[in-house]
Amino acid sequence: MEKIVVALGKRSYPISIGEGLLTHAELFKSAIKGKRVMIVSNEIVAPLYLACCKETLIDFQIDEIILPDGEKFKNLHTFEIILTALLSNKHARDTTIIALGGGVIGDMAGFAAACYQRGVPFIQVPTTVLSQVDSSVGGKTAVNHPLGKNMIGAFYQPQSVIIDIDCLKTLPAREFSAGMAEVIKYGILYDQAFFIWLEENVTAIKTLQPAAITYMIKRCCEIKAEIVSLDEKEGGIRALLNLGHTFGHAIEAEQGYGNWLHGEAVASGMVLAAKTALNLGLIESAQIEQIILLIKQFDLPVNAPENMHYDQFFDHMQLDKKVLDGKLRLILPTSIGRCEIFDNVSETVLRSVIES
């Protein structure tokens, strides 16, 4: 088992990574303060892993909420269902919420934990690549609004993140590929050596070799933990983690949440960001080709949706949370392993990239 600590002073917490961790009772017990837990999961994950979790938590009083699966249910209505279940079962401030599922479950359960009685403890138990390498770490919690993704939320850190890599054995191929977009993102924005390692280990990753998967998840979590420790609430360097997301969120919102998976939209968004950087003379064309090839090797899209035009992109991008003083800020790669924030990209350049 590998361990990483997200260093945030009194709110620091461990990330545990390994095989069979859903059965490690001590990992859960050390993060649960009271006697009651509320497990939040969905109709896909619950039949696979809920019974195992309940067996591990046999010493606690357990309630559960099983939600419908999918990004389209990440909304205020579903959020209210979680709160109603907590209230109707008379949960108090010493209840611990356990998010058992992918990014949607983690985001909603975490936001419920942040809001319920002004904050109760929660544990992230991510079951997808995307949630294991990205969304479960760092304390971002949210629900979507019809006008924008993750517009209603809070920064709220978990007590612990427990990553059982065995959960990936039941993950559909499309979901696995979507998660790999966030993995590739770390290589592009922060760690050239990790990007090269990904290029060299495509087969080992796609065949779920435990050593490769464990290292991959650990390295992603190390990078995110380091960045979050420096900038918890995205006032500076943490914004770099949004590489590809300004374009990607526009794709998700315009296409309808769930029609393009988040990782698919981010993959396309990273290519658009890289092409924008190329247009501005910030990055070499050979490195763009490397980025596109690696994204393709994990069966991810490298083009924007054919039915999306510049005006549709721009309307959604204006709602991006990184907009400051009316200026759109873009995260652009200047080389593989390094990104910077730019707030002076002209509409002419953006139009050229999107319509090319």
Swiss-Prot record:
<keyword id="KW-0057">Aromatic amino acid biosynthesis</keyword>
<dbReference type="Pfam" id="PF24621">
    <property type="entry name" value="DHQS_C"/>
</dbReference>
<dbReference type="GO" id="GO:0000166">
    <property type="term" value="F:nucleotide binding"/>
</dbReference>
<keyword id="KW-0963">Cytoplasm</keyword>
<keyword id="KW-0028">Amino-acid biosynthesis</keyword>
<dbReference type="GO" id="GO:0009073">
    <property type="term" value="P:aromatic amino acid family biosynthetic process"/>
</dbReference>
<dbReference type="InterPro" id="IPR056179">
    <property type="entry name" value="DHQS_C"/>
</dbReference>
<feature type="binding site">
    <location>
        <begin position="69"/>
        <end position="74"/>
    </location>
    <ligand>
        <name>NAD(+)</name>
    </ligand>
</feature>
<dbReference type="Pfam" id="PF01761">
    <property type="entry name" value="DHQ_synthase"/>
</dbReference>
<dbReference type="InterPro" id="IPR030963">
    <property type="entry name" value="DHQ_synth_fam"/>
</dbReference>
<dbReference type="GO" id="GO:0046872">
    <property type="term" value="F:metal ion binding"/>
</dbReference>
<dbReference type="InterPro" id="IPR050071">
    <property type="entry name" value="Dehydroquinate_synthase"/>
</dbReference>
<feature type="binding site">
    <location>
        <begin position="167"/>
        <end position="170"/>
    </location>
    <ligand>
        <name>NAD(+)</name>
    </ligand>
</feature>
<dbReference type="GO" id="GO:0005737">
    <property type="term" value="C:cytoplasm"/>
</dbReference>
<feature type="binding site">
    <location>
        <begin position="127"/>
        <end position="128"/>
    </location>
    <ligand>
        <name>NAD(+)</name>
    </ligand>
</feature>
<keyword id="KW-0547">Nucleotide-binding</keyword>
<dbReference type="InterPro" id="IPR030960">
    <property type="entry name" value="DHQS/DOIS_N"/>
</dbReference>
<feature type="binding site">
    <location>
        <position position="245"/>
    </location>
    <ligand>
        <name>Zn(2+)</name>
    </ligand>
</feature>
<protein>
    <recommendedName>
        <fullName>3-dehydroquinate synthase</fullName>
        <ecNumber>4.2.3.4</ecNumber>
    </recommendedName>
</protein>
<comment type="similarity">
    <text>Belongs to the sugar phosphate cyclases superfamily. Dehydroquinate synthase family.</text>
</comment>
<feature type="binding site">
    <location>
        <position position="182"/>
    </location>
    <ligand>
        <name>Zn(2+)</name>
    </ligand>
</feature>
<keyword id="KW-0170">Cobalt</keyword>
<keyword id="KW-0520">NAD</keyword>
<feature type="binding site">
    <location>
        <position position="262"/>
    </location>
    <ligand>
        <name>Zn(2+)</name>
    </ligand>
</feature>
<comment type="function">
    <text>Catalyzes the conversion of 3-deoxy-D-arabino-heptulosonate 7-phosphate (DAHP) to dehydroquinate (DHQ).</text>
</comment>
<keyword id="KW-0862">Zinc</keyword>
<dbReference type="GO" id="GO:0008652">
    <property type="term" value="P:amino acid biosynthetic process"/>
</dbReference>
<comment type="pathway">
    <text>Metabolic intermediate biosynthesis; chorismate biosynthesis; chorismate from D-erythrose 4-phosphate and phosphoenolpyruvate: step 2/7.</text>
</comment>
<keyword id="KW-0456">Lyase</keyword>
<keyword id="KW-0479">Metal-binding</keyword>
<feature type="binding site">
    <location>
        <begin position="103"/>
        <end position="107"/>
    </location>
    <ligand>
        <name>NAD(+)</name>
    </ligand>
</feature>
<feature type="binding site">
    <location>
        <position position="149"/>
    </location>
    <ligand>
        <name>NAD(+)</name>
    </ligand>
</feature>
<dbReference type="GO" id="GO:0003856">
    <property type="term" value="F:3-dehydroquinate synthase activity"/>
</dbReference>
<dbReference type="GO" id="GO:0009423">
    <property type="term" value="P:chorismate biosynthetic process"/>
</dbReference>
<dbReference type="InterPro" id="IPR016037">
    <property type="entry name" value="DHQ_synth_AroB"/>
</dbReference>
<feature type="binding site">
    <location>
        <position position="140"/>
    </location>
    <ligand>
        <name>NAD(+)</name>
    </ligand>
</feature>
